[in-house]
């Protein structure tokens, strides 16, 4: 059986945590993008997650979620709200997202 890639491992952890994240933080969707999706990550790369919420969080709760995800995955997470994407960069991000 082939060894799981870090991306696959992270995706599995996120899938398992989705119900809890939905309950605690009102997370509606999670999608990943960036260097891990392109298989260009380096040792110090962060893990980029695009998130939508069923109810917008406070800044404190958003940062707490980002920190909790970093702790769960064991790598720095860069959490981006889908609603806040700027059109110029957003179209590039949306081309490579992988839903969790």
Q: What kind of feature is each model-predicted range?
A:
Residues 1-29, 37-43, 53-100:
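Catalytic core of pol beta-like nucleotidyltransferases
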Residues 32:
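Conserved histidines in hydrophobic membrane contexts and catalytic metal-binding motifs
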Residues 48-51:
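Short beta-strand->loop micro-motif that forms the acidic, two-metal-ion catalytic signature
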